[in-house]
């Protein structure tokens, strides 16, 4: 795969192009699941890039591991994380308005809205008020990221949710930004693969 891509595969490359049997084997061996410990896997293969050394040796690796392993019975945490990602301009804190924008952008895409309530129609989804959306965002993903985010997600005055100050010095690093997006994209795709099985999300593609 590395030779065909012309670079080391990231998580999404592995998810997309890995043989199904190999992918399932990785999932069934949690301790050795490279999707849950990607940077450690890359380091072990001797493929860590120079610009990733700071990420690996510092708190950034622990943060990425939190994103890789956070519980996802629903996909609600992902639009919150994308609000922080902010199209590559990482925010240290997000407001309710910024969360709402990211939330609606995510759930307005395709049929993602169905994940809010499997019994809901599209018309009912469109009728949900911004106030109702914000209430759900704060009560569910924001709350649970604070509870299970190992201190990386905190409450800060003037914001709905913030990143720990420990991350401030690294959030502008190219490696941090690239891995942040890669993890979130992977978690979204993997979630929908599991949810729909052989439905609309198809994982396997061929290289070449």
Task: For each feature predicted by the language model, list its residue ranges.
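Intrinsically disordered, charged low-complexity linkers and terminal tails
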Residues: 1-208
